[in-house]
């Protein structure tokens, strides 16, 4: 039997090329994910450092200064210390729920970064339902907190978990009509389309000016979703010791703090995308995207400028959130629920009704 070696070599080279294509495709899929995870880690470290420095400035004291220049490595030092601490488990608690609770909270928040555009087409998943996917994913995190509180077999932890669930439900509902209003104005629920819709009219086309009521409700609701002061009822130190975190130690305790700062960064980025024009910085008479060619340039420089503008706006919102922490006193639980159900929800629904009416009359 004579075998045609030419055909055999052609078949082998074809299979090799196909396998190489699969390998290259996998590599190109993993590289953006790795870069995003690295950027998120660096962003969280910067947020922790900023919060400590701003808090020290507000309280007129010296902040962290020993770990690295200006104390910039303090968060890394704290994380390393928590990593080597003993992982204690409650003797009569549900160990399974106790162990997976922090992981669910962190993973649910990490998935939200899939639909956040950091630049022109610089997004992992440009979905047609991007903003609603974020709302759906963010509702998973309180389940992890409730599991942690229940699995701890501690009354303070359980109360903290119940408060976290109640607070999340109370403030996700007013937040959703605000996002619906933005989708109506942009004729899309894709985060990339929402940014591009704002870029059509320059600086005054930002949804901040077109939706001031929605922006205010979204800002308050996002602070409550992040459980930041004055909405940190689930872990009120004076009442619940540390809430659902009471029985935790070591790396699991650190995961809750990572989840908190990740959630704060997600909220800041969504405020930037929905209301502040995303990667576009359109100053009157000076269009930065046109000046640098952000929307046309596909190179590294254009992407870098877009990422820088997005993060600059997000960190401005972070500065406001951190300052609010040391400005307003903590609310009572009844005040918190009344604010969400009796004030923010009717206002957000009224804003949605007005937006719908204007869109219908403008057709």
Curated annotation (Swiss-Prot):
Family the UniProt entry places it in: Belongs to the complex I subunit 1 family.
GO BP: any one term: photosynthesis, light reaction
UniProtKB keywords: Chloroplast, Membrane, NAD, NADP, Plastid, Plastoquinone, Quinone, Thylakoid, Translocase, Transmembrane, Transmembrane helix
Record localization: Plastid, Chloroplast thylakoid membrane
Protein name as catalogued: NAD(P)H-quinone oxidoreductase subunit 1, chloroplastic
Membrane topology: Multi-pass membrane protein
Subunit-structure text: NDH is composed of at least 16 different subunits, 5 of which are encoded in the nucleus.
InterPro entries: NADH_UbQ_OxRdtase_su1/FPO, NADH_UbQ_OxRdtase_su1_CS
Pfam families hit by this protein: NADHdh
GO cellular component entries: chloroplast thylakoid membrane
Function description: NDH shuttles electrons from NAD(P)H:plastoquinone, via FMN and iron-sulfur (Fe-S) centers, to quinones in the photosynthetic chain and possibly in a chloroplast respiratory chain. The immediate electron acceptor for the enzyme in this species is believed to be plastoquinone. Couples the redox reaction to proton translocation, and thus conserves the redox energy in a proton gradient.
MF terms in GO: NADH dehydrogenase activity; oxidoreductase activity, acting on NAD(P)H, quinone or similar compound as acceptor; quinone binding
EC number: 7.1.1.-
Catalytic activity: a plastoquinone + NADH + (n+1) H(+)(in) = a plastoquinol + NAD(+) + n H(+)(out); a plastoquinone + NADPH + (n+1) H(+)(in) = a plastoquinol + NADP(+) + n H(+)(out)
TM region(s), chain numbering: 27-47, 104-124, 127-147, 248-268, 300-320, 343-363
Lineage: Eukaryota, Viridiplantae, Streptophyta, Embryophyta, Tracheophyta
Primary localization class, coarse: plastid
């Amino acid at each position: 039997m004579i075998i045609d070696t030419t055909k055999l070599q052609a078949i082998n080279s074809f299979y090799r090329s196909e396998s190489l294509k699969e390998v290259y495709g996998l590599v190109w899929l993993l590289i953006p994910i790795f870069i995003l995870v690295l950027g998120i880690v660096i962003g969280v470290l910067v947020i922790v450092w900023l919060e400590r420095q701003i808090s020290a400035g507000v309280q007129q004291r010296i902040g962290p200064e020993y770990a690295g220049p200006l104390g910039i490595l303090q968060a890394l030092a704290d994380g390393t210390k928590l990593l080597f601490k003993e992982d204690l488990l409650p003797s009569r608690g549900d160990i399974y729920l106790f162990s997976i609770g922090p992981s669910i909270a962190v993973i649910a928040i990490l998935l939200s970064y899939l639909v956040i555009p950091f630049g022109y087409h610089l997004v992992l998943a440009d979905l047609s339902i991007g903003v609603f996917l974020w709302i759906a994913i963010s509702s998973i995190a309180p389940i992890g907190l409730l599991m942690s509180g229940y699995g701890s077999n501690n009354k303070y932890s359980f109360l903290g978990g119940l408060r976290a669930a109640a607070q999340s439900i109370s403030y996700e509902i007013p937040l959703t009509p605000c996002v619906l209003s933005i989708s109506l104005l942009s004729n899309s629920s894709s985060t990339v389309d929402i940014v591009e819709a704002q870029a059509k009219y320059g600086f005054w086309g930002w949804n901040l000016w077109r939706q001031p009521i929605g922006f205010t409700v979204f800002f308050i609701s996002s602070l409550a979703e992040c459980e930041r002061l004055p909405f940190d009822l689930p872990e009120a130190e004076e009442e619940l010791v540390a809430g659902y975190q009471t029985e935790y130690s070591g790396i699991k305790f650190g995961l809750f703090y990572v989840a908190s700062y990740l959630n704060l960064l997600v909220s800041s980025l969504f405020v930037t995308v929905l209301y502040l024009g995303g990667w576009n910085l359109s100053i009157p008479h000076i269009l930065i995207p046109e000046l640098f060619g952000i929307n046309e340039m596909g190179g590294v420089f254009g992407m870098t400028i877009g990422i820088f503008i997005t993060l600059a706006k997000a960190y401005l919102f972070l500065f406001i959130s951190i300052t609010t922490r040391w400005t307003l006193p903590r609310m009572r639980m009844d005040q918190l629920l009344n604010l969400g159900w009796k004030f923010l929800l009717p206002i957000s629904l009224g804003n949605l009704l007005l937006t719908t009416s204007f869109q219908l009359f403008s057709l």
